[in-house]
Structures are given as structure tokens and as C-alpha cells.
């Protein structure tokens, strides 16, 4: 317990991260690896909330000719598929896990109830929040920020395919510069690709730090909660 800097965390996993190199669907090898890393944290006594995206299955913006609200609801359902896959993988490792959804589907998951979520965390269960906020026009980044505030998380761990925040796309620009630290205002003013502006503003208003790091490097989640210098930290000062 001595090397834990953050006792209660919100882990934000993109749908693309769960797809691995396939880019679509679920790569169960990746899901299992992530689950093992989460189990390691649970065994250390870290309380974990998680939000999963749905971009590996559906993105609202993909439905160009669709009603935006309908397309967004389809995206929310996609996050539920990912949440159930992660839950199953964690439970196979013996980790007690609950899925809570913002849209009621009582046959497969609990509805989101803040007090119940807090109780699960206190009992050492992982809580996966799915179906976004339950409202269209809000991203899963905003869901992560909102749920982090509601469960009083110490930090949001934003797992990406890149090892931090850069001034340019590092995949396209060899000389892209990585930031070690940023303020919320930096992110908003410069339009940096961390979270969308709604999510960033919510984190700023509630003083929730955001750590952006690469998910594909084994052990990075453990390093993150231990306070080791990885990725990019976004905070007040």
C-alpha cells in the first residue's frame, strides 16, 4: 500500500484500445492483458471505476445520414458490449465486478446509482460504467469526467494508443514534442487532443487530474497509480 499514490481511480479505456491491432471488434488477448493489470491493482487495494468507449463497434459520427440522437444511442449500446466483455474477463480472474449502465437494462447490468457504486468500490469491487451519460451529444470522455466526480476519484487514467499528449500528431510528425505536464487551460486554449472540451472543463471545475498514457506498454497502469513519471499529467498548476 505504501507505493500507492492514488487510492481511488477512474480508468478510461477507449473502444479502439480493446480492439488491439484489429481496429474493430474485441481482441480478447488485449482484454485479458488489461484485466490482469486491473487485478494487480485490486490486489494492491486500489479502488477502480472504469469507463469504456464503444468506438471499436460503433461511433455516433459514423452514422452520417442518421439522426444524431439515434446514432449516439447506438454508440451507448456499443459501450455495454465492451463493458460486459471486460466484466467477464475480470471475473474469470476472480475479480468481483459490477457493470452499471446509464440506460436501464436490468437483465444484464445494474442501473447507475451513485451510492451503490461507492459501496461496491469500498468493498473492493471494480465498477464499470457503461452507456455513457445516458444522453446523446455527450462523449464517453465526458462520462469518465462525470463519474469520476461522482465517485470522488483521485485521478482519471486516460489510456490511449500514444504515450502522452503532443503538440502535433506523433504518427504524422517525427518532430512532435511531448508535454510532461499541462494545465486544463493549456488544453482548452491550444485545442490539444486530450479529452473533449466538455470533459476537460468538468475536470477543471472539480480539480480532477488527468493522466494520459500508453495502454500498450505492460505495467503502465501500475506505474500510473504509483506516481511514476509516465505520459502527460493535466492538472490545475
UniProtKB/Swiss-Prot annotation:
GO MF terms, alphabetically ordered: ATP binding; UMP kinase activity
Residues that, per the record, bind ATP: 12-15, 55, 59, 166, 169
Record GO biological process: 'de novo' CTP biosynthetic process; UDP biosynthetic process
GO cellular component annotations of the record: cytoplasm
Biological or metabolic pathway of the protein: Pyrimidine metabolism; CTP biosynthesis via de novo pathway; UDP from UMP (UMPK route): step 1/1
The protein's assembly and partners: Homohexamer.
Name of the molecule in the record: Uridylate kinase
Gene assigned in the entry: pyrH
Amino acid at each position: 500500500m505504501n507505493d500507492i499514490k492514488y487510492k481511488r481511480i477512474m480508468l478510461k479505456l477507449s473502444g479502439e484500445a480493446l480492439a488491439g491491432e484489429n481496429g474493430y471488434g474485441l481482441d480478447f488477448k488485449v482484454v485479458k492483458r488489461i484485466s490482469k493489470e486491473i487485478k494487480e491493482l485490486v490486489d494492491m487495494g486500489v479502488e477502480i471505476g472504469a469507463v469504456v468507449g464503444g468506438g471499436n463497434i460503433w461511433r455516433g459520427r459514423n452514422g452520417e445520414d442518421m439522426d444524431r440522437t439515434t446514432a449516439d444511442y447506438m454508440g451507448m449500446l456499443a459501450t455495454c458490449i465492451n463493458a460486459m466483455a471486460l466484466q467477464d474477463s475480470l471475473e474469470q480472474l476472480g475479480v468481483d465486478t459490477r457493470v452499471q449502465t446509464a440506460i436501464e437494462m436490468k437483465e444484464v447490468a445494474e442501473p447507475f446509482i451513485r451510492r451503490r457504486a461507492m459501496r461496491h468500490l469500498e468493498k473492493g469491487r471494480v465498477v464499470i460504467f457503461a452507456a455513457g451519460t445516458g444522453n446523446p451529444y455527450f462523449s464517453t470522455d465526458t462520462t469518465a469526467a462525470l463519474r469520476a466526480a461522482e465517485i470522488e476519484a483521485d485521478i482519471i487514467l486516460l489510456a490511449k494508443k500514444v504515450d502522452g499528449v503532443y503538440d502535433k500528431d506523433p504518427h504524422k510528425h517525427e518532430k512532435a514534442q511531448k508535454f510532461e505536464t499541462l494545465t486544463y487551460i493549456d488544453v482548452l486554449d491550444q485545442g490539444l487532443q486530450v479529452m473533449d472540451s466538455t470533459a476537460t472543463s468538468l475536470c477543471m471545475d472539480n480539480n480532477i487530474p488527468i493522466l494520459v498514457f500508453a495502454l500498450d506498454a505492460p505495467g503502465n497502469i501500475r506505474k500510473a497509480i504509483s506516481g511514476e513519471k509516465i505520459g502527460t499529467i493535466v492538472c490545475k498548476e
